[in-house]
Amino acid sequence: MEKTVDQPIIADTSGLVSLVTDTDQNHDPATKAAARLAEVSRPIILPSDVLVETVNVLGKKSGHGTALKAAGELLRPGSQFILIETRPYLLRALENFKDQSPAVSLTDCIVMTIADDYDTKDIFGFDKQFADAGYTRIAPSTEWHEEA
C-alpha cells in the first residue's frame, strides 16, 4: 500500500474502528498499516461522514468515553489524519450509490468518490466492497470472516 509520501489514502470506518478497538479481529492489521503510513508520512484523508460514523459505532460498541478519545486522536493537530468536509462530494456519491448493491452504504460511496477525486485507489478500511469496486483495502486478518 506504500505510495509516494504525498499520495493520500482515504479513511473508512471499518479501518478506524479496527484501529481503535484492541479486541477487533483486524486490530493488528490496522495498527500495522497505520504505522507504515506514519513512517512514510503518508496522509490519511478523514471524510467528516466517516468521522461521525466511526464515533457512532465506537459509542455503541465501546462507550462514549472510548468514542470521544478516538475522535480526539483523529482530530489532534499534527496527526496524520486530515479532516475534510464531504458536502462537495455528496451529489456524485449519491449518483454512485443508486447503482450499488444493498451491502454498499452511502458512506462507502462517499469514500470512493473522495478517493477518485484524490486520484488514489487506496482505502484505509477492510470492507470487501472496496476491493470489488477496484480499490485497494487493508488486507484483513486471516481469522476475519467478512459479510458480503
Label the predicted regions.
Residues 1-6, 112, 117-148:
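Acidic, PIN/NYN-like endoribonuclease modules and their adjacent C-terminal/linker elements
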Residues 1-46, 59-71, 145-148:
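Short, well-structured N-terminal submotif of metal-dependent ribonuclease cores
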Residues 11, 45-46, 84, 106, ...:
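Short beta-strand scaffold positions
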Residues 17, 52-56, 94:
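Amphipathic alpha-helical segments within well-ordered protein domains
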Residues 40-44, 79-81, 119-121:
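Short active-site oxyanion
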Residues 56-59, 116:
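Short glycine/serine- and small hydrophobic-enriched flexible loop segments
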Residues 73-86, 99-100, 107, 131-148:
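Short acidic, glycine/proline-enriched helix-loop-strand junctions
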Residues 82-121:
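Active-site neighborhoods of divalent-metal-dependent phosphate/nucleic-acid chemistry enzymes
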